[in-house]
Amino acid sequence: MKGFAPISLVILVIFLFSVGVWSSEEADEGVAPMEKTEQETLYSAIQGFVGKWWNGSDLYPDPCGWTPIQGVSCDLYDGVWYVTSMNIGPILDNSLNCSPSAKFRPQLFDLKHLKSLSIFNCFLSPHKHPVPIPSENWWNLAGSLESLEFRSNPGLTGQIPTTFGSLRKLQSLVLVENGLSGGLPTNIGELVRLKRLILAGNWFTGQIPDGFGGLNQLLILDLSRNSLSGPLPITIGSLTSLLKLDLSSNQLEGQLPLGFGNLKMLTLLDLRSNNFSGGLTKSLEEMHSLEVLVLSKNPIGGDIKTLEWQNMEKLVILDLSGLGLIGEIPDSISNLKKLRFLGLSDNKLTGNLLPKIATLPCLSALYLHGNNLTGELKFSESFYHKMGSRFGAWNNPNLCYVSGMVPAGHVPFGVRPCQQGEEEVTLVEKPNSKTQLGDEILNQNSHYTTSLGISSFGIDGFWWLSGFLQLLMFLLLT
């Protein structure tokens, strides 16, 4: 046994030496240096946003070590700390908040390892203190920047600088609810690594550039709530990786492109509140992954039976309201077993309403008002209990309900009871004021969310749908 003592001693020495080396490496990483130039550059860039009172060297003498700055992240390069992420704005209680005189300082563009830049709720006054996005120096970040996000900055004005086209590593460009205007730069189409392009809620004008069709890795394209006009570019059919396409609330026009049929991965298409016309395109049938289709408030026209709706079996939300559609509601819609919301209001639809539509297992909101539907509502008592106020059929003069099939308290708003042997009938619960009717319409809008179990608290205008669609896309992508 004594012969094993030297061997044990050697093993112990090796073990202790290994632990010492490991501990030394950990310690070295913990006290890794930061270049003084990088440190001063960081302080100056932040000071431009939060104000001259902010003294970074006193408050955060070791910003990548034992005195970290909220919203700033660092990584090691060759044993030295460099800033890789900066988030400015009131995200958390101790976040860096902007001053009323916030501005971009040129030192921001000297952070040569910066991968992510986010500025939220910083530039707030478009009249007293408008701030344009700097037009120069973005090429200094061309080798590092992967994510650029400006949100809720109404005082951030002017155009998107063409120098954004130099950011060839960019994967996410998000410019939402700012005061930006002008046309969309064509060279954004050269950012071929982009996966998210979200430019919603600004004042952009002009047409969508053809060059956007070159973004073949794009997953989300959201240009909603701007003033874009003209037809959709044919090249949009080249975005075959797209999961979400939201072009709602613009002034886009023309026919729905045949290229839509190439978007096999698309789960959400929102084109509401534009000027599209020319009928429903058959290419919509080829979008087999589609779960949300919102075309409402467009003068599209044509026959609702143009499409074989059973081919879109994954649909959860279908809103065709306000399109000027004609014809009878097709039986094929009754094959959409996952459908939760169906909006067919304010069209020119005719014919009897098939009872089968009420048997859709997931349906929790059905709006048919403002058409020329006829005959009896032959829905079961359980249907009315299930729907409550989420069923709308008013303003169909020749439509009536069978009294014995409707439970007390669930009489369909604005629909007359079917009566035999009487020439005069009156509408039940006819709205006695514009306010009452307006409340019902508002109630319909809120059911995009409530019919799916999502609270409508805080909904304002079209924000209710945008918020829901964003939440739904988040769930789909994760």
Where are these regions (language model features)?
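The feature encodes a structural signal of leucine-rich repeats
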Residues: 104-109, 128-139, 157-162, 181-186, ...
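Consensus "Asn ladder" position of solenoid repeat domains
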Residues: 122, 153-154, 178, 199-202, ...
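Tandem repeat domain/solenoid detector
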Residues: 169-171, 179-186, 190-195, 200-219, ...
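Leucine-rich repeat
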Residues: 110-114, 139-145, 153, 165-170, ...
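LRR N-terminal entry segment and analogous cap-like coil->beta motifs
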Residues: 78-158
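LRR flanking "cap" motifs
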Residues: 48-102, 127-131, 302-309, 313, ...
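Membrane-proximal ectodomain caps of single-pass cell-surface receptors
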Residues: 263-267, 285-292, 296, 301-303, ...
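Surface-exposed cap/linker segments adjacent to membranes
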Residues: 2-73, 84-91, 121
